[in-house]
Amino acid sequence: MIGRLRGILLEKQPPEVLIEVNGIGYEVQMPMSCFYELPNIGEEAIIYTHFVVREDAQLLYGFNTVKERALFREVIKANGVGPKLGLGILSGMTASQFVSCVEREDVSTLVKLPGVGKKTAERLVVEMKDRLKGWGAGDLFTPFTDAAPTDSAAASSNSAEEEAVSALLALGYKPTQASKVVSQIAKPDMSSEQLIREALKSMV
């Protein structure tokens, strides 16, 4: 079981990062709410991981705090919710926002998340409301900021849009939906991370 990685960020391709630890590169998929808070490429990062073994793959899901990882593990315990859907859920909103939605039984907001229909949203509320009692939000979770991306190197407008669409597809959004929302919000000076952030905000 791989539970924590501390190393140098080599690549950031939303929603995946490549982090080098003692000469070994680990590919880690992260919710966008955590991805935004990562340091620059070439800098040290600490990622708390959840390890998934399938017949065809071994996957790592990463988080900035132990609490965020714990919430992810609670989410994927819900009937019909796997790691990919859990990643999409915690990309569409922050951990604290999700906890708040469950506590308030806000099904109408949950159904806006990728892959979450009404039945799944209702199931999340029913199955998780008691389990999340007392969690609270505050400083336990990574804040969802509007700060500019940390990487100094900005991609061109077209490649940023393509990268944003690819990230949304990886999170479970449909191709037509992803392309439409990115084209609507895209501006020449926006990075892929800014595009993804604004796209996710507009769809929730």
Curated annotation (Swiss-Prot):
Superkingdom of source: Bacteria
Region (Domain III): 156-204
Cell membrane among keywords: no
GO terms (BP aspect): DNA recombination; DNA repair
Stated role: The RuvA-RuvB-RuvC complex processes Holliday junction (HJ) DNA during genetic recombination and DNA repair, while the RuvA-RuvB complex plays an important role in the rescue of blocked DNA replication forks via replication fork reversal (RFR). RuvA specifically binds to HJ cruciform DNA, conferring on it an open structure. The RuvB hexamer acts as an ATP-dependent pump, pulling dsDNA into and through the RuvAB complex. HJ branch migration allows RuvC to scan DNA until it finds its consensus sequence, where it cleaves and resolves the cruciform DNA.
Family statement: Belongs to the RuvA family.
Protein name: Holliday junction branch migration complex subunit RuvA
